[in-house]
């Protein structure tokens, strides 16, 4: 009697586990099983919760757009860092005008940050002035330092 009860229960449990494994291996979750591009009201006349765009899909869409924005920002930062570090003799200014761009080893690197507000040539004197003011304040507050030329190295 006990075997007759346990055998169907075991088979049912096994089939449920196999079904869930199949669904998740195909990427099917509760919000993504069925997505109809047409409006659910137009196709059936009734609003079915299973065929509308779920909240999890909206969050995925927002994550995708923010990921694209973050990727674009990081690639712009990477290009600016490459432009600053790869050009020999650069004064940390990627906007300087090269007299002969065809003879330069890196013709594109001089114009990478023209549209970037943070690294525009208008901000360069302000940035140097701020760092010099900080250096003067630190040297005035610290008095005689054990390493007097720490900030001059950078």
Curated annotation (Swiss-Prot):
Signal peptide residues are 1-19
Sorted UniProt keywords: Amidation, Cleavage on pair of basic residues, Neuropeptide, Pyrrolidone carboxylic acid, Secreted, Signal
Return one GO MF term: corazonin receptor binding
Q: Which residues cross the membrane?
A: none
Q: Kindly list the biological process annotations in GO that this record carries.
A: acetaldehyde metabolic process; behavioral response to ethanol; cellular response to ethanol; courtship behavior; neuropeptide signaling pathway; positive regulation of heart contraction
Propeptide stretches are 70-154
Tissue localization of expression: Expression is restricted to 24 neurons in the larval CNS (8 in the brain and 16 in the ventral nerve cord) and 12-16 neurons in the pars lateralis of the adult brain.
Asparagine amide modification sites?
Answer: 30
Where on the chain is Pyrrolidone carboxylic acid found, per UniProt? 20
Q: Name one Pfam family in it.
A: Corazonin
| GO cellular component assignments | extracellular region; extracellular space
InterPro entries, A to Z = Procorazonin (IPR020190)
Its family remark reads: Belongs to the corazonin family.
Known function: Cardioactive peptide. Corazonin is probably involved in the physiological regulation of the heart beat. Clock (Clk) and cycle (cyc) proteins negatively regulate Crz transcription in a cell-specific manner.
The protein here is known as: Pro-corazonin
The source organism is Drosophila erecta
């Amino acid at each position: 009697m006990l075997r007759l009860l346990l055998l169907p229960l075991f088979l049912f449990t096994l089939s449920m586990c196999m079904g869930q494994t199949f669904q998740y291996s195909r990427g099917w979750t509760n919000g993504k099983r069925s997505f109809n591009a047409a409006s659910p009201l137009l196709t059936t006349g009734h609003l079915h919760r299973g065929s509308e765009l779920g909240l999890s899909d909206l969050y995925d869409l927002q994550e995708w757009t923010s990921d694209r924005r973050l990727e674009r920002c990081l690639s712009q930062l990477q290009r600016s860092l490459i432009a600053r570090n790869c050009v020999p003799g650069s004064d940390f200014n990627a906007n300087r005008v090269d007299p002969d761009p065809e003879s330069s080893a890196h013709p594109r690197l001089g114009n990478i940050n023209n549209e970037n507000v943070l690294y525009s040539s208008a901000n360069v004197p302000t940035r140097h002035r701020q760092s010099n003011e900080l250096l003067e304040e630190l040297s005035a507050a610290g008095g005689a330092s054990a390493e007097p030329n720490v900030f001059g190295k950078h």
